[in-house]
């Protein structure tokens, strides 16, 4: 019988392989990963959740993914991700960087776990945050424009179901 740690590593390895193969098949040459310094420090999500969450080896996860991507010719970049979960991507809210220098009101909010409500639409909160991380990266590289925004809004408004089989 496999240990839980080995089983988790096997699932992660298969997930990485699937992700890297998908990126290659779609001709994606840059993977943007959000980072937030000290994000696992001093969290307060309950004693049991703190123990479970802070035990997840995200640094190891990120390094392994970066290694496999770079092996496949995909550049991996890290993007500071403060305020990406609070800002509405669909409403094109500005995204301040940490520490926030001015008061900004955001047009949307998390309505419940996993959902973000903008002015007119509801979107998965993780998708909203991910799109904002990408937006921050593109803005910092002077590559953000209205065409990219409208394309991404169209893509995230028509989700696809992906099934991954683990043998």
Which residues make up each language-model segment?
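Positively charged, helix-rich recognition surfaces that bind polyanionic ligands
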Residues: 1-167
């Amino acid at each position: 019988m496999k240990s839980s740690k080995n089983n988790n590593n096997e699932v992660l390895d298969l997930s990485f392989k699937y992700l890297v193969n998908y990126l290659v098949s779609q001709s994606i040459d840059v993977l943007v990963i959000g980072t937030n310094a000290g994000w696992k420090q001093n969290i307060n999500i309950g004693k049991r959740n703190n123990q479970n969450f802070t035990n997840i080896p995200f640094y190891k996860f990120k390094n392994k993914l970066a290694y496999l991507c770079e092996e496949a010719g995909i550049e991996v970049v890290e993007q500071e991700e403060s305020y990406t979960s609070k800002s509405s991507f669909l409403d094109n809210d500005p995204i301040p960087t940490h520490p926030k220098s001015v008061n900004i009101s955001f047009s949307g909010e998390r309505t419940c776990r996993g959902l973000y409500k903008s002015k007119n639409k509801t979107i998965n909160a993780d998708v909203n945050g991910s799109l904002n991380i990408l937006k921050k990266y593109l803005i910092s590289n002077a590559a953000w424009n209205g065409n990219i925004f409208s394309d991404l809004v169209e893509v995230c408004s028509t989700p696809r179901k992906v099934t991954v089989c683990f043998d």
